[in-house]
């Protein structure tokens, strides 16, 4: 494998329920990219947008070459084909990693999945198939998956497709919640990229998001 190379895969919800948060999402995503560009090591970026359809926006772009997200890229519409987006991303990355020469394969693969609603529109993939795919890559190759969900029990939903409670968190789907989300994700991805063993990073990564959600629901 190629030391210090990370494949970053961002799966972003742009379904209609994200309306009103377009600029917050764009700003948060761009700030996260800027932060990643400051880190040591190489990274390729794959960005997948989904509503009732799945769109590949960045296809393993070198991190330094990824342009900022704009409203031409990110606009909301439609329903939530969450499983199709995850399945497409995992399938794509599996094919890439398997077919590259061993010395060109990424040392780490990190998925960040963000959605504000439950699955309701997928046609190709179901929960059981996604669970098998994710568990295989986690167990055999140490891939990391972070799941951030709003308007749901994110831990329970993540468990349905093979992501553990220590890698799932519920966030508040408003401007402040989205900002906290991207800040935490950015710092967590930085830690995972620099860690000898990303799996050693525990559930503490999500404490700030949990605290933000809890605070607003106590007010």
Identify the function of each model-found stretch.
Residues 1-219:
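Acidic, low-complexity intrinsically disordered regions
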